[in-house]
């Protein structure tokens, strides 16, 4: 496993990291023993960064992860959780200082730890950015001073939300950003933001290397917001890889983990075999010829992508549906 520095935090994270959203039991009842085995496989394979949120399964993911972490030496992993988004289905978003404090304490109890390495404002496209700057981030830094978290981050889908916060706060206020669906085979729009983020000293966490199912043989869910052009283009890429006996997920994960300025890419699963496959993928050399062929097939899509990415959503209701589908169906998974 390779490791990269996460911004200016001073820590080095595995290029492939574990998203525990699947532990929320959305598709089926959570099997705690399987969760424990999955996490053990991830850690034994060199993964050292774990991300979760109280929103995933409405605290079920944190609870299951806490059971899986029980007995594991704290120094073996870096742990991240979030505040602000609690239930997409119920529209429960609250970025107030009071809820933020209560949420982190509750998360620590569920996770069975005394502190998290990273606490993140979750899906800040749903928040009043004045509140994020003037209330939420100051509260997170207060919790940091109390020793409950080491670093502070922000997460979201539209890329423009990151400068809208970072340009309003002092350097060092935000240590990391988490972006999803913007560095993958069919959408590399995150690349344009990387020089800015490096200048700000902010570490980059990437997620959803398969575009929420676009780059998989199983295809996408009904709610997926991608256009017919993007869906068809990705389908051709999937079929091209299959014709060569390759699961495109392998190439997608390898590509997502290949950028030297992106510290880590999250994948999620509750199956030991699947996380083992992903670890094996990043340890094997990428087929550069196949990559060139797939990127050529996807070029008509890439030139259509706006600065906000292929999954850019204009309306708030559209964003809510996308994020609701994403987080409740745990499609960080490959």
Question: Model-flagged regions — what are they?
Answer:
Residues 21-33, 86-99, 127:
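Active-site mouth loops of central-metabolism enzymes
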Residues 109-127:
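Active-site groove signature of glycoside hydrolases
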Residues 8, 66-74, 109-112, 166-170, ...:
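Acidic (Asp/Glu)-rich catalytic clusters
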Residues 6, 18, 35, 50, ...:
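Conserved, mostly hydrophobic/aromatic
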Residues 29-42, 95-111, 158-167:
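Short, acidic/polar
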Residues 312, 317, 324-334:
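Low-acidity, Ser/Thr- and Arg-rich intrinsically disordered low-complexity segments
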Residues 124-301:
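Beta/alpha (TIM)-barrel catalytic core signal, keyed to glycine-rich beta->alpha loops juxtaposed to Asp/Glu
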Residues 1-77:
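N-terminal binding-site loop/beta-alpha segment at the start of enzyme catalytic domains
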């Amino acid at each position: 496993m390779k490791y990269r520095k996460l911004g200016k935090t001073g820590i080095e994270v595995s290029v492939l990291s574990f998203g525990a959203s699947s532990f929320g039991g959305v598709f089926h009842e959570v099997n705690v023993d399987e969760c424990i085995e999955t996490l053990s496989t991830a850690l034994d394979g060199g993964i050292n960064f774990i991300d979760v949120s109280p929103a995933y399964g409405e605290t079920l993911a944190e609870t299951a992860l806490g059971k899986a972490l029980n007995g594991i030496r704290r120094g073996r992993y870096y742990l991240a959780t979030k505040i602000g988004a609690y239930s997409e289905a119920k529209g429960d978003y609250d970025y107030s200082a009071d809820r933020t404090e209560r949420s982190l304490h509750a998360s620590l109890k569920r996770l069975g730890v005394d502190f998290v390495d990273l606490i993140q404002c979750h899906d800040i496209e749903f928040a009043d950015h004045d509140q994020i700057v003037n209330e939420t981030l100051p509260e997170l830094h207060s919790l940091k001073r109390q020793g409950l978290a080491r670093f502070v981050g922000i997460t979201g889908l539209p890329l423009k939300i990151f400068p809208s916060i970072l340009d309003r706060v002092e350097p060092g206020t935000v240590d990391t950003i988490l972006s999803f669906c913007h560095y993958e085979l069919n959408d590399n729009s995150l690349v344009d933001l990387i020089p800015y983020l490096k200048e700000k000293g902010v570490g980059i966490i990437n997620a959803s290397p398969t575009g929420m199912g676009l780059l998989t043989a199983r295809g996408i869910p009904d709610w997926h917001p991608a256009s017919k052009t993007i869906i068809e283009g990705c389908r051709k890429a999937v079929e091209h890889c299959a014709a060569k006996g390759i699961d495109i997920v392998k190439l997608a994960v390898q590509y997502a983990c290949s950028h030297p300025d992106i510290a880590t890419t999250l994948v999620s699963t509750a199956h030991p075999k699947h996380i083992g496959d992903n670890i094996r993928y990043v340890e094997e050399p990428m087929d550069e010829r196949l990559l060139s062929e797939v990127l050529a097939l996807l070029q008509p899509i890439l030139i259509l992508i706006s600065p906000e990415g292929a999954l850019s959503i204009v309306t708030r209701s559209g964003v809510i549906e996308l994020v609701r589908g994403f987080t409740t169906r745990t499609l960080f998974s490959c």
